């Protein structure tokens, strides 16, 4: 019940934050003299696919990056941090790629293969390497 109320209140706050009010009380003089209040305020774009004015760049004045690639880079940096922390933890617990694969119950996902490459590099050099997200060919 608390979760439902919390969701309803947060949704209401979010919707109220995204709206603009031109006037709370309208007088008949304003509405009869060709009021432009309906067209004076632009609607805010609520999704990244619809941009009312132009494409916006979060980090740069030039618009060389599109909005989708900026949003993807946030996910990539979070994935880099999470996977690097996971690999370091596994390495400190002295878990080999075979034991990691056994813990994953034999599933051969990308983490098992990448951990093997990362683990081999860490064993060969003696330093902890950084794992970097590599975009699959379907995205490029």
UniProtKB/Swiss-Prot annotation:
It is found in: Secreted; Host cell. Keywords: Secreted, Signal, Virulence. A motif (RxLR-dEER) lies at residues 56-72. The keyword tRNA-binding does not apply. The keyword Transmembrane does not apply. Induction: Expression is induced during host plant infection. One of its GO terms (cellular component) is extracellular region. Residues 1-24 form the signal peptide. Its main location: secreted. It comes from the Eukaryota. Belongs to the RxLR effector family. Effector that is involved in host plant infection. Contributes to virulence during the early infection stage, by inhibiting plant defense responses induced by both PAMP-triggered immunity (PTI) and effector-triggered immunity (ETI). The RxLR-dEER motif acts to carry the protein into the host cell cytoplasm through binding to cell surface phosphatidylinositol-3-phosphate. This is RxLR effector protein CRE2.
């Amino acid at each position: 019940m608390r979760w439902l109320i919390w969701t309803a209140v947060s949704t209401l706050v979010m919707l109220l934050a995204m709206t603009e009010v031109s006037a709370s009380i309208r007088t008949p003089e304003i509405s009869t003299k060709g009021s432009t209040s309906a067209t004076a305020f632009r609607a805010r774009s609520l999704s990244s696919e619809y941009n009312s004015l132009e494409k916006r760049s979060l980090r740069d004045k030039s618009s060389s990056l599109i909005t989708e690639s900026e949003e993807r880079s946030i996910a990539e940096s979070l994935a880099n941090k999470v996977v690097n922390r996971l690999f370091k933890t596994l390495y400190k617990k002295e878990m080999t790629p075979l034991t990691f694969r056994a813990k994953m119950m034999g599933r051969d996902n990308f983490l098992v293969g990448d951990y093997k490459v990362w683990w081999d590099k860490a064993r060969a050099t003696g330093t902890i390497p950084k794992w970097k997200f590599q975009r699959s060919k379907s995205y490029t």
